[in-house]
Amino acid sequence: KRFVPKYNAYVGSFFQNLQWGGWDLNTEWAFKSREAVLDRNGILENSSGLVLYTDLGYSTDGFGINLQHKHTDHFDFRVSPLEILNQGLINYIPPGARMNTYRLTSRYAPATQLVGEDALQIETVFSPSRNTQIQVNASHVQGPDRELYYQEWYAEAKHKFNKQITLSGGLQRVIYNQQLYEFKPGAPLVKTWTPFAELTYKINRRESLRIECSQMSTDQDLGDWLWGLVEYNIAPRYSFSIMDMWNYGNKNPDKRNHYYTAFAALNWPGLRLTGGYVRQVQGIICTGGVCRVEPAFNGLRFSLSANF
């Protein structure tokens, strides 16, 4: 349908925070005037947009629960309607699911569908003792037509044995719409089971050793994976790590590859320098809470960040 595009778009928002006892209620409503936006099929349409976000939480000694709901409808706000993916974004709408940090638990991560989605997430944290914490999270994301986009069940337990040793472990279940998130027509829903564990050992006041391991089981995409990491830290300046991601369950025996990485980091007041060898598989890479699809890569990588 033809239309005359608007060269100006107007946005506004309303938010409130209500606290009473252990209860906390946050709501936010943002709206955008009509402008040209791309739909899921890459066709421009003249549409207004809105986002409704609700967060209800309750906490008391040793227990907390949080319920979140997010409704997004055509709130794609960019410098140009022809920009796609992470290009030209003016605002940021967080995904309606848990932000995972382990390599395999974050391999299939959902990106907010700005054209339209409904997301529901609930999380509980229980501390039966000072040294033990149990966390359970569930999230469900679907489209306007109730098509399943993403679903996750996550449970983790963490225990501090003494001043030196801390152990955590858990299990994740994910159902992921790869056709939608990675633009792969005809791809089936990816269904995974991922157990994981992490051990931190403080050698002394300055030195520590951290070990991660996880395993992903799936019959879709590239099959099963194993992941391992060893990290040695000398506070507050140095960090060294080696890791391997092994695609041992690939249906093609010739592609059951190892993806090695070795990194070193130097921290200085206001400065952080990292460098190392990276071999990564194509897929979603999450860094600092931002997830994006990256190509396969094999080579040296350096980064420098500075605060002024």
For the regions a protein language model found, what residue spans apply to each?
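Exposed, low-structure sequence patches enriched in small/polar residues
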Residues: 3-308
